Amino acid sequence: MDEGKFIVLEGIDGAGTSTQGPLLVKYLFEKDKKNVVLLTREPTKLSPYGLELRRRLTGNLLPGEKIIDDPEYWSNLFISDRTWHVHNVVGPALRLGVQVVDDRYDLSTISYQSAQGREMDELIQKHLGLPVPDLTLLLDLPVEIAMQRAGKDSQRTKEYFDDHAFQEKVRTNYLVAAQKLNKSRNIVVIDSSRPIDEIAKEIQHEINKLYGYQ
């Protein structure tokens, strides 16, 4: 049995990863009805690390608990959750031939926690040994547009990293990290300031190249 492909969607908050993920899953199934596709995301809702991340990101602190602004604390939690995710969800699925679409992966931690002050190269090193995606789609757009979109999402909870200046740093770091890693990885930067259908078509073009679809 051939292994599935590992596809990752990345981008700052409001970039549209949660919109494009389901569209990509639908497209993969439409192109080949034999495709079994898993849409997953990080931080997870399954591991103790992911649950702790989600609690802290949304500011759901316990009485007397303080906000932690330590980039090492955050990066360790994210990487622990990612390692759990790979060992328990992503890896087993890929080995079964499932096509895995992951909303956020290593570029997220590399970009966010380097914006907090950790060395980017150190964060890259900490991810060595984890599966390398077959394709990473980095959805890039101006922070102003991303924040407008995020603000219109009534289902979205305001999070710890929701700050304009911080998101500007994260956006820059995403692009720097993509350039650093693209020598050894398949990373495509996509302009996600455009309408949803235009973004989806460009993603589909990259998927066609990856799978050899016509």
Regions found by a protein language model. Name each.
Residues 2-6:
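Pre-Walker A (Motif I) flank of P-loop NTPase domains
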Residues 9:
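Hydrophobic anchor at the beta1->P-loop junction of P-loop NTPases
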Residues 12:
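P-loop (Walker A) phosphate-binding loop of NTP-binding proteins
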Residues 17:
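Conserved lysine of the Walker
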Residues 20:
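Hydrophobic positions on the alpha1 helix immediately C-terminal to the Walker A/P-loop
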Residues 25, 144-214:
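NTP-dependent small-molecule kinase module
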Residues 34-124:
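ATP-dependent small-molecule kinase phosphotransfer cores
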Residues 104-172:
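A glycine- and Lys/Arg-enriched "phosphate-lid" helix/loop adjacent to the NTP-binding pocket
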